Amino acid sequence: IFAFLLAIYRFSVLTTVGGRVSAQLKSDKANTNNPLGRVLKIHEDNPNMDTETLELKLSEGVLKETPELESGLTLLKIIAAIAPLMGLLGTVTGMILTFQAITIFGAGDPKAMAGGISSALITTVLGLLVAIPTVLMFTIVNGRAQRIIHILDEQTTGMVAEHTEAKLRS
């Protein structure tokens, strides 16, 4: 449930941010309510800077925005990786208990063994029930974050190119 709530929250945040970035793409004035606007503001605030320094400043701006865009993704990835392992741990523990019961009581009652094995496998199923949707949610949310980061990279490259062209013309 935690992974689902985290994914929904990050998806909604990134959808809002993505909408603001899209609006910023259509605007000439930098609006600091979105990552692209904050990066554009760096360009606006430094019109006479040499190209190399501007490129470094813009890259720094993108790097500052990236952690907020990728927030929560590592936790989703960890949950997706650990859930099946926890299920497997439960299965192994259940199988150990089943074999201990066989050692004590013998293998005469297959129903008793089947029940133990069945309950042991339930933990694997539960682990997979957590992991599979979490991997899917991680992929969707990560894709949304990476699209925004790609826009930032693309726009900063364009700003550096325009800045270089303007310097060459003058």
What are these regions (language model features)?
Residues S12-A107, L136-S170:
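Predominantly long cytosolic amphipathic alpha-helical stalk/bundle segments
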Residues F4, L40, G87, I117, ...:
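Residue-level signature of catalytic and energy-coupling elements of molecular machines
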Residues I1-V17:
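Hydrophobic alpha-helical transmembrane segments
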